[in-house]
From Swiss-Prot:
One example GO MF annotation: DNA binding
Chain ranges of the GIY-YIG domain: 20-97
Subcellular location: Cytoplasm
Name assigned to this protein: UvrABC system protein C
Gene coding for it: uvrC
Domain UVR: residue ranges: 207-242
Subunit structure of this chain's protein: Interacts with UvrB in an incision complex.
Length: 639
């Protein structure tokens, strides 16, 4: 494709017809990938800035790569802000300020559609039916709170299916984490009273709750019901301890405390969550920013991107003013369909102290981040020199596979970046092995073999022996990966590392040639006796070489390889475990679909079936003692 004009000349040509109105513009590279999305109060004036002479290096690189430019007119600046935020979220342009790793925060959910409501963790922006408490800064925070609540209030956490299948109390009852409503150990009225207490606690009404419990304890004592009174006493003590440990603020009720700091062109935004006056944890973010970005700009973009995924509290308290605060407030209100929010920068008092605390945490988080970043950059430079790369790698993809003689085969990809592993980019490839030449040890019947490949376990793996064809598995994984990279060229890796040797090198070259791609790659194989520290590296056009096992770059490459290896084994075992759970019951003579369903319904889960005694198995409808013994023996046979 031949382009007539690009870069600044393209922008000059677009200026002729550019309107003096608010809107959003988009810059594209030669592959029509979005490089940058920007908003403007006046599109003509904003685009004019890109043909001036005092631009920073990153902006100059962006303009040089711009081959297409489009703009959209909006009715207001708020609309422009909204559209810009939506497009940045959708396209993740490389030259924009980006907020990465922004998962939605978890909540505690109390279901209200059951006679005995369930307490569970919930993640997602759309809050379905039920009562929600939070958000919490991390799964650790919410899991810890749930554990404490179960110790104190003993509400059920099981699913409805498990609840309905119980004929005896489960382990949670035995360890005093549940009152076992499933088998009538507590009535509806008493359980509802506990639900009300949980609501009061999570909504911050701890003083009223403790007063009510104290009155109830005295009442029970006066009635000589000392055991029940002692239980209430222990609950009051536990509530006091949890409240003290969680940290309670009398300064804010529902608020996000947000502080931004900068050092050497890197930014950290620390967010503290307060709900119902209780601290719900904190989390640091490290948005990527351009060279000439300011704190005001980074914080503005952070707020717009952050509150596209997170729930908005009544108050947002920040440590730095933003330029376009009123429009940002209006945009956040429209994004979340709410009527009122308040963004403030306190100068004194309790709120200012909370902001100062968040800023102190942000500085510490940024220093730790920069240490990790600097160390990683040193290693990345050594990798660049070692493998003759044109630039310091920003994204390294590492590939491995796992199987047992071709069964339950999976390939995996793990990703390492500027500051370590990027786990949200990890991928698992379920390898479809029936296309290979298979030899079943149990039967030469092709139909039976294909049936075993796709037996209703949801795992598309061959039940026969495919001779462990690593090359074909790698070919499939890379074919699927490169197909995806054609659609996502902005995710092209700087380097691919494949766990394998000379033969794998040829497969990678074959697939690369087929896709006409030129991504640098290297194969890393075990050395003598497959001992760590003697790894061999295979690169096209070079002799096989090894590295001193004490070199930092060698240790780093081993860490990359081991991460991929462990991720592959983990996912292989998951697949194998799912298949074994089903097939073990399927393989027992006399246990068909009806009896299998009866077993699972009676015990509630496959694990519970395995834990059952012969006597307990024989209590299931349709299972006699002889069959119970057979089931028990098969389930307790070693793999």
């Amino acid at each position: 494709m031949t382009l007539e004009i690009t870069g600044s000349e393209l922008i000059k040509s677009k200026l002729i017809d550019a309107p003096e109105r608010s809107g959003v513009y988009r810059m594209f590279d030669v592959n029509k990938q979005v490089l940058y999305v920007g908003k403007a109060k006046n599109l003509k004036k904003r685009l004019t800035n890109y043909i001036k002479s005092n631009l920073d290096n990153k902006t100059l690189r962006m303009i040089a790569n711009t081959c297409f430019l489009e703009y959209s007119i909006t009715n207001s600046e708020v609309e422009a802000l909204l559209l810009e935020a939506q497009l940045i979220k959708k396209f993740q342009p490389k030259f924009n300020i980006l907020l990465k790793d922004c998962k939605s925060f978890p909540f505690i959910k109390l279901r209200l559609d059951h006679d005995f409501p369930q307490l569970l963790k919930y993640r997602g922006k759309t809050l379905s039916d039920g009562k929600f408490f939070g958000p919490f800064a991390s799964s650790v925070e919410v899991n810890t709170t749930l554990t404490e609540l179960q110790k104190i209030f003993k509400l059920r956490s099981c699913t409805d299916n498990y609840f309905n299948s119980r004929t005896r109390p489960c382990l949670q009852y035995e360890i005093k984490r549940c009152y076992a409503p499933c088998v009538g150990k507590i009535n509806k009225e008493d359980y509802r009273d506990l639900v009300t207490q949980v609501k009061d606690f999570l909504q911050g009404r701890t003083k009223e709750l403790q007063e009510n419990l104290s009155r109830k304890m005295e009442e029970l004592s006066s009635q000589m019901r000392f055991e029940e009174a002692a239980e209430i006493r222990d609950r009051i003590k536990a509530l006091s301890y949890v409240q003290l440990k969680a940290g309670v603020s009398d300064v804010v009720k529902d608020a996000d405390i947000i502080a931004i700091v900068e050092k050497n062109g890197h930014y950290c935004v620390e967010v503290f969550l307060y709900r119902a006056g209780q601290a719900c944890g904190n989390i640091p973010y490290f948005p990527t920013a351009t060279e000439n970005s300011t704190k005001e700009e980074v914080l503005e973009y952070f707020l717009l991107q952050f509150y596209q995924k997170q729930h908005v509290p009544a108050a947002i308290i920040i440590n730095h003013e933003i330029n376009d605060k009123e429009n940002v407030i209006e945009a956040i209100k429209k994004i979340n369909n709410i009527l009122q929010i308040n963004i403030t920068v306190p100068n004194k008092g309790g709120k200012a102290k909370l902001v100062q605390n968040a800023e102190t945490h942000a500085l510490f988080s940024l220093e730790q981040y920069l240490k990790k970043f600097a160390k990683n950059q040193e290693i990345m430079f050594e990798i660049k020199e070692l493998f003759g790369l044109s630039e310091i790698p920003e994204r390294i993809e590492i590939y491995d596979n796992s199987h047992i003689q071709g069964k339950f085969a999976v390939g995996v990809m793990v990703v390492a970046g500027k500051v370590g592993f990027d786990k949200k980019e990890y991928r698992v490839f379920n390898v479809h092995t029936p296309s290979l030449v298979c030899h079943s040890r149990e039967s030469g019947d092709p139909k039976r073999l294909m049936d075993s490949c796709f037996r209703g376990n949801g795992i598309k793996n061959c039940g026969g022996d495919i001779k462990g064809d690593d090359y074909e598995m790698l070919r499939q994984v890379l074919t699927r990966r490169l197909t995806r990279l054609r659609q996502e060229p902005h995710k092209l890796p700087s380097l691919m590392i494949i766990d394998g040797g000379k033969g794998h090198l040829g497969v990678v070259k074959e697939v690369m040639d087929k896709f006409e791609m030129n991504i640098p790659f290297v194969c890393m194989s075990k050395g003598v006796d497959r001992n760590a520290g003697f790894e061999q590296f295979h690169v096209i056009g070079k002799e096989v070489f090894t590295l001193d096992k004490n070199l930092p770059v060698m240790k780093y490459l081993q860490i990359l390889r081991d991460e991929a290896h462990n991720f592959a084994i983990k996912n292989h075992r998951l697949g194998r475990s799912r298949a074994i759970k089903i097939s073990r019951l399927d393989d027992i003579e006399g246990v068909g679909e009806t009896r299998k369903k009866a077993l699972l319904h009676y015990f509630g889960s496959y694990k519970a079936v395995c834990d059952a005694t012969i006597y307990e198995l024989a209590k299931v409808n349709g299972i006699n003692k002889l069959l119970a013994e057979m089931i028990f023996n098969v389930l307790h046979r070693k793999n």
